[in-house]
Design a protein with these regions (language model features):
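Alpha-helical membrane-protein architecture signal
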Residues: 77-85, 258-269
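Loop-to-transmembrane-helix entry motif
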Residues: 88-92, 268, 272-276
Length: 278
């Protein structure tokens, strides 16, 4: 699994490096270098949340050793911090393979200065932290719903399939969307600046705007603190909540005779609907 993960990270890094090389120069020379960073910020947040949201739910609230750790004289804040570190590193891996090529290509093809270097590194940090915040909030919502639903594994599996479908739909349309973006840079830039000012500030941050760097980092730190405060007040109740599922009683009966392919198919379908990770 480690080899597969490294291959996936390498593949994504190569794809987004090529994307950076293809659009960075045109956007920078059009005076829209900030829009270049804004585009990759959105992609980085999407990938960071997509890559870590399920790990947030399973690793934070459904970890098998939660009961053991909570029974030991370990502060809850220490347990929560260790769980959040794992979630953060997962999100950093997925967002970093997008943001790191974006920043390096900008330094090479557009501008290399102290402000640009600091702004680029700060942008990578901000995106990874915002991905952590969004993953934690989504994981918290999922955990609250999960504790009240029946057929939890089936619903979680369906939700995962929907997210995967949305992800691949975006990937397949990425080239067409980028072509439309490049054809209407001025209109897109005006729309983002007027209707999504925080994203504009993050784009300016990547270019080395000191005011944008200070504002974005301050807001990001505040959001991280509020998220930790929310999780610290609800973690114990959710992590120790007993599920409402009832176990089926075994009833003796005759097993139907099936062919080997049919039996294997039935077994795999059962695993698919009972295990979200599968």
């Amino acid at each position: 699994s480690d080899v597969c993960s490294s291959d996936l990270v390498g593949l994504l890094g190569g794809m987004f490096t090529l994307l950076s090389l293809s659009i960075c120069g045109a956007m920078y020379h059009s005076g829209l270098g900030w829009l270049y960073f804004t585009l990759f910020t959105v992609l980085g947040l999407f990938m960071g949340v997509f890559g870590s949201v399920f790990n947030t739910f399973a690793g934070l609230y459904q970890a098998k050793d939660n009961d053991l750790l909570l029974s030991l004289p370990i502060p809850i804040r220490a347990i929560l911090a260790s769980r959040l570190l794992g979630v953060y590193l997962m999100g950093l891996m997925f967002s970093g393979v997008i943001m790191l090529p974006c920043v390096i290509v900008y330094w090479i093809a557009a501008e290399l200065s102290a402000a640009a270097v600091i702004g680029g590194l700060a942008l990578i940090l901000a995106v990874s932290l915002l991905a952590l915040v969004l993953s934690c909030l989504l994981g918290w919502v999922v955990a609250k719903l999960y504790s009240r639903l029946k057929h939890k594994n089936l619903l979680t599996t369906l939700a995962a399939l929907v997210l995967f479908g949305a992800y691949y739909a975006v990937c397949f349309r990425a080239s067409a969307l980028i072509e439309r973006l490049l054809a209407h840079l001025d209109q897109v830039g005006a729309a983002v600046r007027g209707g999504a000012y925080p994203l504009y500030l993050m784009g300016r941050m990547g270019q080395g705007d000191w005011l944008a760097i200070a504002l974005v980092l301050a807001v990001t730190a505040l959001l991280c603190w509020l998220t930790y405060l929310l999780l610290s007040r609800t973690f114990l109740a959710i992590a120790t909540a007993k599920t409402s599922e009832t176990k089926k009683a075994y009833k003796e009966g005759k097993a139907a005779l099936r062919s080997i392919p049919a039996a294997l198919l039935s077994k795999e379908l059962g695993r698919l609907t009972s295990s979200p990770n599968y």
